[in-house]
Amino acid sequence: MKRVLALIFMMVLAVSFSSCADSSQDVEVVPRLNEDVQTDEASLMPDTEKETEEQSMTEHYTTNTKIEDVINDPVFGDYGRLIFPVDSGYYGGSTLGNLSLTWYNYIDSDKTVEICNYMRNQAENGDTIFYDIYTEEEKAADPAKKDTGLFFFKGNPGTKFAIVNAGGGFAYVGAMHDSFPHALELSKMGYNAFALIYRPGAQTACEDLSRAIAFISRHTDELQVD
């Protein structure tokens, strides 16, 4: 009986030592894997993100900037009015810091400021950040089409693109909270992103999205998107 117990005890010790040896090997491997992952992530970082880290963005706007000052900033031309809801009845507040949007909560004022500064810097540097999707003739025939277009958040040249559509209950377009932030983050990842400003309404919204897709498809070379 004593021999049997001794044999069992020795077997348990052997298994324990084996487990410890395996665990120590795993601990040694993990740091190497982490090092490899970090190296790969650095090499795959989009060019636009590297440039963003290297170059600080000029802060033209702050949380105290009046919304109307952004809308009427000459650098945006006529499309400044489309940065915020066309129908002012769907947003409140007088500054970027206290902007509110109907049916939305938790609006990040810092993100609002970041987006407005990004747009201004891009436009000031000569980059096109807004594209009409309808011709002047089409807009003259249907004035509602004047309140449409694509805001472009540029990623790496030749990369895939996405169209981001904000909600608003088909009553208005809540882009500042519901599509601009997403488009900006996609561009930081290297993707080309478009935020569509469409005519509220289930049918007209779909028509504008269809037109936006057609517009991008016809101008892939000019836009440098895939």
For the regions a protein language model found, what residue spans apply to each?
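Short beta-strand element of the alpha/beta-hydrolase
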Residues: 159-168
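Sec-dependent N-terminal signal peptides of Gram-positive bacterial secreted proteins and lipoproteins
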Residues: 3-22
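N-terminal targeting or regulatory segments adjacent to alpha/beta-hydrolase or S9 domains
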Residues: 20-146
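Gly/Ser-rich "nucleophile elbow"/oxyanion-hole loop immediately N-terminal to the catalytic nucleophile
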Residues: 215-226
